[in-house]
C-alpha cells in the first residue's frame, strides 16, 4: 500500500478491494467444542456463550470450582465423540501427557464435521500432525490456528501460526510477576500449591499451630502411614487435605501440637514419601 500511495493510487479503493481476504463465517449460532474445562477453558466457554455460540464442553476431571464457574448455558459432554461430531469449532485446553498426546488424531478428525476449525493454544503434541496435514489439504479441517507452528504446517494456506501472546501487554507482564511472587510466598509461608504444571492444586486454611506439607507418590496406604506416625506421637489431626495429579500427590496436615524431629524423620522415611516440610505459626 505504501508504494501504491506514493504513485497516487486511491488508497481507499485498494483497501476496500482487500476486504475479501477477511470474509469468514459468523460465530453466532455455531457450536464450539471446548476440550478441557480448567481455569482457561471455563472462561473461553463462558465468553463464547455471550457471543451467541452453542458450547459443548468435555473434561473428565472437572473440578468443583470449575463447575461452579461454568455458565449454565454450557452443555457438558460425557465423551469426546459428542464434541467431535457436533462442533463447528474446537478449542483445546489440556496438558500434554501420555493420555492426551495426539488426542486430535486420524480417528478424531474423521468423526468431525467437514470444514471444522480447530484452535490449539495449549500444547503442540495434542494434535497429530501426520493426521492434521492431509485433513487441512482436503478441506476436512477448514482452518487450524496454533501457537506451536512448524515449517510443515506453515506451508499450508489454512494454517495460522501465532506467537505466544499470553503476556503481551505491559499490564499482563506486571500481573504475571505479581501473581508468581504471591503464589511463591503462599507456598513458602502456607504450603499451598496454586497453578502448578506438575503438581495438584492444594490449598488449606490454617486450623492448627503446626503444618506438615508432604509430597509423595500417588500410591495407596500413604495417608494411613502419615496419620499412624502422628498417632504414635499422640498428636491429633485438626484438618487435612490430599490431592493427586498423575503419579504425584500432595498432602497438607494441620495439628495443634509440636511434631518431634523423630516423627518427621519417620514420615520422611515412609515408602513413596518424597519430601516433608514443617511450618509453624
Label each residue range with its predicted role.
Residues 55-57:
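Short beta-strand "acidic-cap" motif of Rossmann-like dinucleotide-binding folds
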Amino acid at each position: 500500500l505504501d508504494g501504491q500511495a506514493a504513485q497516487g493510487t486511491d488508497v481507499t479503493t485498494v483497501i476496500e478491494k482487500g476486504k475479501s481476504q477477511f470474509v469468514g463465517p459468523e460465530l453466532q449460532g455455531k457450536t464450539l467444542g471446548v476440550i478441557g474445562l480448567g481455569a482457561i477453558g471455563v472462561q473461553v466457554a463462558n465468553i463464547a456463550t455471550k457471543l451467541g455460540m452453542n458450547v459443548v464442553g468435555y473434561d473428565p476431571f472437572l473440578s468443583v470450582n470449575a463447575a461452579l464457574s461454568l455458565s449454565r448455558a454450557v452443555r457438558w459432554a460425557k465423551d469426546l465423540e459428542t464434541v467431535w461430531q457436533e462442533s463447528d469449532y474446537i478449542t483445546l485446553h489440556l496438558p500434554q501427557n501420555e493420555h492426551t498426546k495426539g488426542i486430535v488424531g486420524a480417528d478424531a478428525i474423521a468423526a468431525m464435521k467437514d470444514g471444522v476449525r480447530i484452535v490449539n493454544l495449549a500444547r503442540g503434541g495434542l494434535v497429530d500432525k501426520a493426521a492434521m496435514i492431509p485433513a487441512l489439504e482436503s478441506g476436512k479441517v477448514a482452518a487450524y490456528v496454533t501457537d506451536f507452528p512448524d515449517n510443515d504446517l506453515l506451508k499450508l494456506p489454512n494454517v495460522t501460526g501465532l506467537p505466544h501472546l499470553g503476556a503481551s501487554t505491559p499490564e499482563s507482564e506486571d500481573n504475571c510477576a505479581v501473581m508468581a511472587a504471591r503464589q511463591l510466598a503462599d507456598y513458602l509461608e502456607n504450603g499451598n500449591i496454586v497453578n502448578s504444571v506438575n503438581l495438584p492444586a492444594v490449598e488449606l486454611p490454617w486450623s492448627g499451630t503446626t503444618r506438615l506439607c508432604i509430597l509423595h507418590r500417588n500410591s495407596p496406604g500413604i495417608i494411613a502411614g502419615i496419620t499412624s506416625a502422628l498417632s504414635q506421637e499422640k498428636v491429633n489431626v485438626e484438618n487435612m487435605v490430599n490431592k493427586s495429579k498423575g503419579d504425584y500427590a500432595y498432602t497438607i496436615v494441620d495439628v495443634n501440637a509440636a511434631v518431634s524431629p523423630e516423627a518427621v524423620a519417620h514420615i520422611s522415611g515412609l515408602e513413596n514419601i518424597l519430601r516433608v516440610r514443617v511450618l509453624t505459626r
